[in-house]
């Protein structure tokens, strides 16, 4: 597990879309997809808060602040690959860890959560760019946290 600076605001990029796209809260406010990297808004600016489990963080957007966190859909106790934003709470699907993945130094992290375990990683579909969880080792699972002081924010 990697320690992340929780005092910073970030954009999240992956090696599948490289510099062209960043991860953002969708227009309906409940799902995630990759959007044009030139359109940075509060929906695509992220911050992390610590959890009560060492090395795990909650992921929030500036749009919703700490009241909403990235979570895994719990389908009657069955692990899901689907993600959504939910009220922040002590839910294992909101506990995310960043692991060093040294196959690409520009995108050094893979993200997994406590609910589905370290075998399922944050990924995006190649056709829709919608975020989901998947096993394996695919380019959409290699992530970089880019400090927001290096990006230009546009009005939404």
Each model region followed by its residue ranges:
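Lectin-like carbohydrate-binding module/patch detector with strong preference for beta-trefoil
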Residues: 1-156
């Amino acid at each position: 597990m990697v320690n992340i600076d929780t005092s910073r605001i970030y954009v999240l990029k992956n090696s599948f879309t490289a510099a062209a796209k960043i991860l953002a809260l969708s227009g309906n406010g409940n799902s995630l997809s990759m959007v044009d990297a030139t359109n940075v808004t509060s929906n695509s600016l992220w911050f992390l808060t610590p959890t009560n489990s060492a090395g795990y963080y909650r992921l929030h957007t500036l749009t919703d602040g700490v009241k909403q966190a990235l979570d895994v859909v719990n389908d009657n106790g069955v692990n899901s690959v689907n993600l959504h934003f939910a009220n922040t709470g002590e839910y294992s699907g909101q506990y995310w860890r960043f692991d060093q993945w040294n196959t690409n130094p520009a995108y050094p992290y893979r993200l997994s959560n406590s609910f589905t375990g370290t075998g399922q990683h944050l990924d995006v579909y190649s056709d829709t760019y919608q975020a989901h969880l998947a096993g394996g080792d695919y380019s959409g699972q290699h992530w970089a946290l880019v400090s927001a002081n290096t990006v230009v924010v546009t009005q939404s």
